[in-house]
C-alpha cells in the first residue's frame, strides 16, 4: 500500500469517526437518527455517490436510533399513550418507506438532490424559528377517535421521505408529535426513535433487493456508524442538563452550507 493510499484511508477514517461523533451527539440530544446532518459529510467530505450516501445513512440511522431509544426508555422518557401513537405511525411508515425506496431510484439524481435541498430547507426554517425564540405553533388537539388514523397517515408521509432520501425522519416526526399530539419534546423524541427502527429496516431491505447496497456504502456505514453510536450515548447522557442550543446553531450553519452547495450544483446543470 502506497503512502498516498494510506493518507486517503487515514483521511476517510478521521472524517468518518469525527463527523459520526458530532452528528451522534446531536442525535442523542434531540432524539434523531442524525441522517440530515450526515449528508454534507458523506456527499462532500467523503465524496460518496448518492446511492451509497442513502444506504450508509439508513444503516447508521438504525444503529443510532436503536441506541437512543434504549437509553431513553431506560431513563423513563416514554409513556403508554406515546407508544400507542407510535404504533399507529409505524403502520403507515412501513408502507411509506417501501414506496419512497422505490421512488428514489426512479428519480434522476438532479431531482433527488432537489428533493433533499427542499427537505433540508424546511428543517432549517423550523430550526431558525426555534433559535429565534418566542415563535410557537399550535394546531390544537386531535379528537381521540381520530388520533390513530391521523398518526398512521402522517407516518405514511414521513415514511416516504425516509425511504426516498435515506433519513430516519425525526426532524419531521417530532414536530408532529409535539404540536398535533401534545407530547413533551423528550417523549416525542423517544417515540420518534421507536417509529424510526422498523421504518429504516423496510427502506434498507428494499434498497438491498434493488441491488443498491454496495461495499462502499457499507464501509462508510461501519466507520461513521461507530462514531455516531458513541456520540449518541454521549448526547443522550447529557440530554437532561443541556439545551443543545450551541449544537443547534452549528447544525443550522451546516444545513445552510449543504442547501447552498446542492442549489449551486443544480443551477450548473
Briefly describe each language-model feature range.
Residues 173-190, 194:
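Aromatic-anchored, glycine/proline-accented short structural segments
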Residues 31-39, 164-176:
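Transmembrane helix boundary and interhelical junction motifs in multipass membrane proteins
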Residues 39, 63-66, 100, 121, ...:
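Alpha-helical transmembrane segments of polytopic integral membrane proteins
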Amino acid at each position: 500500500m502506497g503512502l498516498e493510499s494510506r493518507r486517503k484511508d487515514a483521511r476517510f477514517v478521521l472524517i468518518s469517526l469525527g463527523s459520526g461523533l458530532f452528528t451522534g451527539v446531536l442525535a442523542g440530544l434531540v432524539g434523531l437518527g442524525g441522517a440530515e446532518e450526515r449528508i454534507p459529510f458523506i456527499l462532500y467530505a467523503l465524496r460518496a455517490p448518492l446511492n451509497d450516501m442513502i444506504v450508509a445513512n439508513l444503516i447508521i440511522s438504525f444503529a443510532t436510533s436503536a441506541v437512543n431509544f434504549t437509553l431513553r426508555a431506560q431513563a423513563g422518557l416514554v409513556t403508554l399513550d406515546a407508544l400507542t401513537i407510535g404504533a399507529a405511525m409505524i403502520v403507515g411508515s412501513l408502507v411509506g418507506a417501501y414506496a419512497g425506496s422505490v421512488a428514489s431510484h426512479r428519480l434522476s439524481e438532479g431531482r433527488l438532490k432537489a428533493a433533499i435541498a427542499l427537505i433540508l430547507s424546511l428543517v432549517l426554517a423550523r430550526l431558525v424559528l426555534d433559535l429565534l425564540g418566542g415563535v410557537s405553533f399550535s394546531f390544537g388537539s386531535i379528537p381521540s377517535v381520530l388520533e390513530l388514523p391521523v398518526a398512521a397517515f402522517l407516518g405514511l408521509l414521513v415514511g416516504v421521505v425516509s425511504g426516498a432520501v435515506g433519513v430516519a425522519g425525526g426532524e419531521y416526526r417530532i414536530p408532529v408529535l409535539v404540536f398535533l399530539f401534545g407530547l413533551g419534546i423528550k417523549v416525542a423524541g423517544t417515540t420518534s426513535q421507536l417509529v424510526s427502527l422498523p421504518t429504516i429496516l423496510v427502506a434498507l431491505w428494499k434498497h438491498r433487493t434493488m441491488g443498491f447496497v454496495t461495499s462502499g456504502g457499507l464501509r462508510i456505514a461501519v466507520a461513521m456508524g461507530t462514531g455516531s453510536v458513541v456520540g449518541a450515548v454521549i448526547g443522550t447522557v447529557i440530554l437532561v442538563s443541556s439545551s443543545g442550543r450551541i449544537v443547534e446553531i452549528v447544525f443550522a450553519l451546516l444545513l445552510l452550507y449543504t442547501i447552498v452547495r446542492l442549489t449551486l450544483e443544480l443551477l450548473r446543470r
